[in-house]
Regions:
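Solvent-exposed, polar/charged alpha-helical surfaces in well-ordered, non-transmembrane soluble domains
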Residues: 28-36, 44, 48, 180-184, ...
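Beta-lactam-recognizing serine transpeptidase/beta-lactamase-like catalytic domain environment
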Residues: 303-313, 345-380, 389-601, 605
């Protein structure tokens, strides 16, 4: 009997514990599971916790993620209230929106416990995603509005590049009724290939309700075609701006280009940029995109089925753009543009003042790379400015007799003058004025390689610097042997320089100090090179030598009547051939400005580059 009693007692205890333990699923646990699946983007797991989920359940949730650009999401259960077989769970959503910030809101989920089971399920409705989606045709949208782009400024504060009113023409796919007709009209009025429109409409991420940018035109162009394109079903229009200088080619390589973001640029910039945004594509517009653009104001809105805004739910204010100050002088730049307007060969011109400020730069052809800053060429006889400095250091004067023979042998290689000219025994000043290669090679034969390196480095050669754009300076490798030294004295061999650098060489002659060039005066530069003196008494002698080039030497085509202009011609051999092809150089001085000109494939500096420089010099102040 005792044993039976124990068994019965055990059964009684089990019954008590069974009554105390409630195996009914907790509504909080069900909601927590649903919210965790929502945060993870597991729509199948969410749907399994919903009573009668709609067929487009997953698509609706994913559309919110895609439209709002949700990078991360968290959903926290705040409370659960139940009564009988129904209840309400309240939650807080925290969404990280790419390129915007954190958006938090409070929402609720209706709960139900169906009659045929004990499990709590979500009684889903569109408002479960957000309370503002009570109407089935309402949806959440994200909009980005960029601030007006800041200007690029010239030295005096006037705009070098600024926006001009324009119209952005686009397409809303869902509103198009005749795509072929629309494409034909765009081709006829705007010259846009129908395949380009197909590519834009078919790009990844494009939704039927999106505004798909197609092209931007200035206001006069839009006014001329408005009657054709505006009535087309599906066309949409937005006010925007076009960027540029006073004329399309004005300082084009410095300013750069501005237009619709490319796939490569989008990958490079990342947030907060998206397809269709207008950005800098080259030059300063690209290099300083974030400064000039600021950041957009992002809004989260509720819109109805017709796309009309019902309510603004959140706003993230963007950052204001900041202007970019440059050293460009509008008047000097205009003179340079005029000088290269008719250029048929690749040409570059740079103007630098005695403080290293870049006052103007132009490169042609427009559609090719920036030769003014990024071109790397043998400087030819313009390098005689540097070689002359080394010779002056070692006692040569303008009156020192030198031998200007037709040819000279150096280490087994024969060097000659341009067009095989010769002057015989002449003063060094005349040899400089006439750009006599053989005289310089002979006179410099007693110099050591280190003498020439030291002179070159006083003019900034072998110094690294940058303007904030791709920049090439000057390179003077230590000559290896007699032949290479002879070539280097006349700016050949391995000696290279950009037009920018040769403009700084000329500027150093004006006041005796080489200054690293500056385009952006407010730009902070780590380890910027220090100014370098070119030597006591040297500038005065060099200016006199260069004055003779213009008055009686190889650079008379650069002369400006009544003006104190100086300069140095250069004819730089490159490539192969007999004779090899040449680039034409000229470095000119007037007032406190130095002008460097190169014409690729030019026959001779005095004949081709000097006239271009002369047109610039004529427009400069004394």
């Amino acid at each position: 009997m005792a044993l039976v009693g124990i068994v019965l007692l055990g059964a009684g205890v089990y019954g008590i514990f069974a009554l105390m333990r409630d195996d009914t699923p907790s509504p909080s646990a069900a909601v927590e599971e649903y919210l965790d699946a929502w945060a993870a983007g597991d729509h199948d797991a969410m749907a399994a916790l919903v009573v009668d989920p709609p067929d487009d359940f997953a698509e609706r949730h994913q559309a919110v993620v895609d439209e709002l650009q949700v990078e991360d999401a968290a959903y926290e259960l705040d409370s659960v209230d139940t009564g009988g077989s129904t209840g309400v769970a309240r939650y807080t959503a925290t969404l990280e929106l790419a390129g915007a910030g954190t958006w938090s809101y409070r929402g609720s989920l209706a709960l139900t416990r169906p009659d045929d089971g004990d499990e709590w399920l979500v009684d889903w409705a569109p408002s479960s995603i957000h309370p503002a989606l009570a109407d089935d045709d309402h949806r959440l949208v994200r909009t980005s509005e960029w601030p007006e782009r800041a200007p690029i400024l010239a030295a005096d504060g006037r705009p070098l590049s600024e926006g001009r009113p324009a119209r952005l023409i686009g397409i809303e796919p869902q509103a198009v009724t005749d795509l072929d007709g629309l494409k034909a009209a765009f081709q006829a009025t705007l010259g846009i290939d129908p395949a380009e429109i197909d590519a834009k409409l078919g790009a990844p991420g494009v939704e039927p309700h999106h505004f798909v940018p197609v092209t931007t035109v200035d206001v006069p162009t839009y006014n001329a075609i408005e009657d054709v394109v505006y009535p087309l079903p599906g066309t949409r229009f937005r006010d925007t701006t076009l960027r540029g200088g006073p004329t399309p080619d004005f300082a084009a390589h410095v300013i750069g280009t501005f237009g619709e973001i490319t796939a490569e640029r989008l990958e490079e910039l990342g947030e907060p940029y998206g397809p269709g945004d207008l950005v800098g594509l080259s030059g300063l517009e690209a290099a300083y995109e974030r400064q000039l653009a600021g950041t957009p104001t992002v809004t989260v809105e509720v819109v109805d089925g017709g796309g009309e805004v019902v309510e603004e739910l959140e706003r993230f204010e963007g950052e204001e753009p900041q202007p970019l100050q440059t050293t460009i002088d509008l008047d000097v730049q205009a003179a340079v543009e005029s000088a290269v307007a008719d250029a048929t060969a690749p040409t570059a011109v740079v103007v630098v003042d005695t403080e290293g400020n870049v006052r103007a730069a132009a490169s042609r052809p427009i559609g090719e790379f920036n030769r003014a800053f990024g071109g790397e060429y043998p400087p030819g006889s313009t390098f005689m400015i540097v070689s002359a400095t080394a010779l002056l250091d070692h006692g040569v004067t303008p009156d020192t007799p030198v031998e200007c023979t037709e040819t000279v042998d150096a280490g087994g290689r024969r060097f000659r003058n341009f067009e095989r000219s010769s002057l015989g025994t002449v003063p060094f000043g005349l040899a400089f004025a006439q750009s006599c290669n053989t005289a310089f090679i002979s006179a410099a034969a007693d110099l050591s390689p280190d003498d020439l390196v030291a002179a070159a480095e006083r003019f900034g050669f072998n110094t690294e610097y940058s303007l904030g754009l791709r920049t090439v300076g000057g390179s003077y490798p230590r000559p290896d042997g007699v032949t290479e030294q002879a070539a280097s004295v006349i700016g050949q061999g391995r000696v290279t320089a950009s037009p920018l650098h040769m403009a700084t060489v000329g500027a150093a002659v004006l006041d005796g100090t080489w200054e690293p060039p500056v385009l952006l005066p407010e730009r902070e530069v780590d380890d910027a090179p220090e100014p370098t003196s070119i030597g006591e008494g040297v500038p005065e002698v060099l200016r006199g030598l260069m004055r003779r080039v213009v008055t009686e030497g190889s650079g008379t085509a650069a002369a400006v009547p009544g003006a104190d202009v100086a300069g140095k011609t250069g004819t730089a051999e490159w490539g192969s051939g007999d004779p090899p092809p040449t680039h034409a150089w000229f470095v000119g001085l007037r007032g406190d400005l130095s002008v460097a000109v190169i014409v690729e494939g030019g026959v001779a500096g005095g004949e081709v580059a000097a006239p271009v420089a002369g047109r610039v010099l004529a427009a400069l102040p004394d």
